[in-house]
Amino acid sequence: MSGPFWLEKQALLMLHSESLAEHGGLCGLRDEGLLDSALARPQNLKAYAPDADMAALAAAYGVGLARNHPFADGNKRAAFLAVGLFLALNGWRLVATPVEATQIMLGVASGELEEDAFAAWIRDHVRER
């Protein structure tokens, strides 16, 4: 494999819109630069740490989106969806209950859970597809 399949901005924007339609929240992108920054985090990680595994790269997406707050609403949901989509694109399936997902993303967004700890949590919650 030449490298991971990265998330496209348009795919994440669609996921975010669908999430808002299903769960509610304010529509809109608050800061496109913050979105671009969050989407670039895993690629930068891979460039500087070539041995970073899929969980570390997925965690970089999750942390970047949850903490950058690029959307008007639904940032934690978008972050978790991005983690799941990235893993799925690369042959993995994230397995977590809604309660687990909520708790982990609250910890990520607040800064209580560091990126390495989030990556470890992801490793414990993925299965090969």
Q: What residue spans do the PLM features occupy?
A:
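FIC/Doc superfamily catalytic core
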Residues: 1-129
